[in-house]
Amino acid sequence: EKIENNKDLAFLSKTLGTINLEVPIEDNLEDFKVEEWDKEKVLEIFKELNFNRYIERFNLKGNSQNTKEQDVEKKEEFKQKDKSIEEVLEIIKKQKKLTFFLKSEKEDGNNLTNLANSEKIIKEKITAISIYNKENNETYYFDFNEEKEIFKFKEILENKEILKTSINLTKVYILLRQIGILIDGIENDISVGAYILNPTNNKLDIKNLTMQYLEIDTEEYIGTEENEQEQLNLFEENTELKNNDKKEYSAYVYFIEMINEKILEKLKEINAYELYKNIDMPTVEVLSSMQWNGMYIDEEELKEFGKELTEKIEILTKEIHEMAGEEFNINSTKQLGEILFEKMKLPIVKKTKNGYSTDVDVLEKLKSEDPIIEKILDYRQLMKLNSTYVEGLKQYINPKTKRIHSFFHQTITATGRISSTEPNLQNIPTRFELGKRVRKVFKPEEGKVYIDADYSQIELRVLAHISEDEHMINAFNNNEDIHKQAASKVFKTPLDEVTKEQRSNAKAVNFGIVYGISDFGLGEQLGISR
């Protein structure tokens, strides 16, 4: 019956799925024959497009004679010198410039309890430093048997008159500060500069930046052996491996200097150098200190909130089981699907290869079918609150500081916004009462308060300026609520009758358009049709 009712669709599908053999082709079959291809030209295109995997897949590494000659030249561009720390310190003080690369390794993970209870924010230790001297075109490498040996560099690292250039300085700041060194004089971070040049580039490590800006494959350049692990001996010092490290990290610090020169040149070309120098680079230190200071968590308040949630979850579990007429695992999609669609005979909205779908979209559509759906949605919300914000936050509380030291990033989002991870402090819920309780566990020090400063609708002001939209400009000039005004027009409601929800929806529309949201994305966010 379904086939008969949809026979037009069936014939259309057949037409679409049939390969047309009657297409007029003017060229000869011989013209399509694959012959020898210009590997040097392909390599050039792949490098331009950063198709590094294809370079490997088609064995194009070092294919051209020019590339090989360039690599030989590049290998002779700097000299690795063995000097004493004292000699190098004098050179740095004289030049008032320090281009460096820190090598760090994860703390001993054999004792997981000690690792979890570590007071360090970043559970890594500094094992070496490489330094580049541009005047003499030399690199120096020092490895440390103990992390505290880097204290020999403390004076120059803390001297703000000595300008520093490196990569991922937010991490460097924390690594140094947690052992008692407060780095100052931060001038250049190549990962930040590269991000400004291309905010969609998420490969900002030294190896990828070297390929992008210098067209050098670091592994090929350094001569990293694939079987390097065979050289490892866990019970005795390995000289060959140490020499490999020396070679590798000396090259890295040299690359940092070369990449930095190219980045600064490009930033000036696009008039973004002042932005980099006066806004983004000072932000590195601000974000680093924010991560270092962390946010205090009231553990007792968190524990009490967790207890409340557990009690509410237990009550909801009991109610759901009673409404279903039997006990089952509410967290099991399979068991929940069987209860709702087989036992309770609710309409099937969507099926997956594993059975019935019970995702939030499906449950939202079934809310009017049975009161159990509302209970299940509430249950899931409470479970997420408990796992993400109660149990989740607990694991990030530093045992010494009693604070959460979230990582703040300025080189991740394509829009230029700051983001945070481990944990994400920017998605703490606010829209419902229980969500607001989560925020109450974050408290300032005694006698201090949190200050929330924000540009007022900055994106829309920029949009008004660029678009020269008279209505928007007038609204801002008259200090009118732009979102409320939009809601009034969209919902055809008098300005003084616009509800909080309508304003919120209009705000989503306004910002969604600015950031290029799709009709599907906006519909999903607002729960409306496309």
Put a short name on every predicted segment.
Residues 1-143, 165, 209, 229-433, ...:
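Conserved "right-hand" nucleotidyltransferase catalytic core of DNA-directed polymerases
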Residues 9-12, 448-480:
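Structured ligand/cofactor/substrate-binding pocket environments in proteins
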Residues 147-162:
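Short, basic/hydrophobic alpha-helical segments
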Residues 162-174:
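Acidic, metal-coordinating catalytic cores used for nucleic-acid/nucleotide bond scission
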Residues 171-224, 286:
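Metal-dependent phosphoesterase core characteristic of DEDDh/y 3'-5' exonuclease domains
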Residues 181-183, 199-200, 216-221, 240-246, ...:
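Short, polar/flexible loop-turn hinges at active-site or ligand-entry regions and domain interfaces
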Residues 480-502:
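Generic long, charged, amphipathic alpha-helical segments
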Residues 505-515:
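Short, amphipathic alpha-helical "recognition" segments used to contact nucleic acids or chromatin
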